Amino acid sequence: MLVFLHAVFITVLILLLIGRLQLLERLLLNHSFNLKTVNDFNILYRSLAETRLLKVVLRVIFLVLLGFCCYRLLVTLM
């Protein structure tokens, strides 16, 4: 039961992190209007690529933990 609660807690934290990363991505895109040099665009491009990669990794971890939670719940109910 403790393992199940721990997995649920981490799943919720991952969802919150994904939401924060989406907010960060929107803020970075809003600041693209203020960029003046090519170096600024390169930094923005790298930052957006890193946030997108991090979102993908967190979503994969989220799906694995969600599957684990569902499996543990089914085992507990049987």
From Swiss-Prot:
**What is this protein's function per UniProt?**
Inhibits the integrated stress response (ISR) in the infected cell by promoting EIF2S1/eIF-2alpha dephosphorylation. Acts as a functional homolog of host PPP1R15A/GADD34 to recruit PP1 phosphatase and dephosphorylate host EIF2S1/eIF-2alpha. May function in the formation of membrane-bound replication complexes or in the assembly of the virus.
* Renumbered residue ranges of the record's region Interaction with PPP1CC/PP1-gamma: 59-65
Q: How does it assemble?
A: Interacts with serine/threonine-protein phosphatase PPP1CC/PP1-gamma; this interaction; this interaction probably promotes EIF2S1/eIF-2alpha dephosphorylation.
The record's InterPro entries line, in alphabetical order, gives: Corona_7 (IPR003449)
Note whether Signal occurs among the keywords. Answer: yes
Signal peptide start and end residues: 1-23
Chief subcellular location: host cell
Query: What ranges are annotated Lumenal (topological domains)?
Result: 24-57
Q: Which domain of life is it from?
A: Viruses
- Which Pfam families is this protein grouped with? Corona_7
Q: Spell out the protein name for this chain.
A: Non-structural protein 7
Transmembrane helix recorded as keyword? yes
Source organism: Porcine transmissible gastroenteritis coronavirus (strain Purdue)
Q: Where in the cell is it found?
A: Host membrane
**Membrane-spanning residues where?**
58-78
Q: Which family does it belong to?
A: Belongs to the coronaviruses ns7/ns7a protein family.
What keywords does the record list, in alphabetical order? Host membrane, Membrane, Signal, Transmembrane, Transmembrane helix
The topology of this chain with respect to the membrane is:
Single-pass membrane protein
